[in-house]
Amino acid sequence: MKISILGGGGTRTPLLLKGLLSLEEELELEELSFMDMDEQRLLLVKRVLDEIAKEGKGKLRLTYTQDIRESIREASFVICAIRVGGERLRIIDERVPLRFGVFGQETTGPGGFSMAVRTIPRVWEITNLLAEVNPKAWFINFTNPSGVVTQAILGYSSLKKVVGICDAPSSIHKVIAQFLNKKEEEVFTDYFGLNHFGWIKGVYVDGEDVLPSILELIKDLPDFERITRFPGEFSALIKMLPNPYLYYYYFKEEATKDLLRAERTRGEIVEEMNAKLFHSLREGSNPLSIYLDYIKEREASFMPGRLKGIALAEGEGYIDVALKVIKGLAKGDAEVAIVNTRNLTAISGLEEDDVVEVPTLFRKDFLRPLSAGKIPAESLAMLKQLKEYERLLIEGVATSSYSTLLHALTLNPWVPSYHIAKKILDAFIEEEQEYFPHPG
């Protein structure tokens, strides 16, 4: 089997390789092709990858290329993890909304909007090429904003063998299992929503829903609010555990004030860490040690505190989901993972072709989202608004329509008014004009 990794110079790529090595014999892996347009970055990450590869059986070939056709040809799976515009434009995504008192974040809100406008056309180019060169391959999308990008692929390309992956739900599952002192496979999290916009409405152990007990425990647990920023009583109020990104929706004012007080955005922190990593890889003699130090620093910067006894490594959620998906689709053993896929009938009240984030069953070359059952009316109303925003955003990109993009941004839950939406959009056009249509 051959697997292609687009964006192979990314900082999570070594973690992905480590995970794939654990399935080297089971999947009969023969080649991993790492493709990246940034040759220098790819060659520096190659130093780390070559060291990690020594842990394998020695039969797996690692190849490196800037030729996307070469990389995707004959691959069974194509993993897409690109960042159009790099960290520089991520920072602009975060900073522009703040000028107008609106929270900026790279995957949701106006920041995610801008990232989607830049990213979707490039992903369409890739998927159109894949449909021409290797239409039988499965396309696994890591590229953010994952849900919107996956929706754009399934709605506007001929590819149907597409899965979108985000680490948030699987990371929540891991934390819950550790909190309950259970193995991950002993716990089922009844999750529903969209990417970075979902809830856990049940946690099942031995057939019993233990979520009510969890909500009661965390209500008076100081560490819970310190780590998640959600007051324990809030989860008890909605009777669900919210995805951490829902903090930006339920607590917009607090989230915006926190970021306005901060000296640097998340993108600026990551940019500095990445620059330090690549400088050290260029100058240092022990690439694997340098990389592991980087991962520890990034992990600590993202989650400075933890619940006692609970640990989660940087990137661990992404890799575990990817391995489950690949193993299930390739081998046929039943696997269940929370991914972004077509709704079908999983969430009643949304359209069949809406991309949702739900537990999904994987078998050989087959997937089927599991039914979410009855969900709260308030959640469905929020999902419908965000889904309409996503549809208009993708339509605006497809038609290069300023007015449609403005309509979409006006519907974004983070944006308080039409006038603010217009100011933000016009500012993005000024800062990132090569990616945006102009008015008129």
Language-model regions, residue ranges each:
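NAD(P)-binding Rossmann-fold cofactor-contacting core
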Residues: L27-D50
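Short glycine-/small-residue-rich Rossmann-like dinucleotide-binding loops
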Residues: S76, R83, N144
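Internal, well-ordered domain-core segments that constitute the primary functional module
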Residues: I126-G207
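Long, compositionally biased stretches enriched for glycine and/or charged residues
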Residues: N181-G440
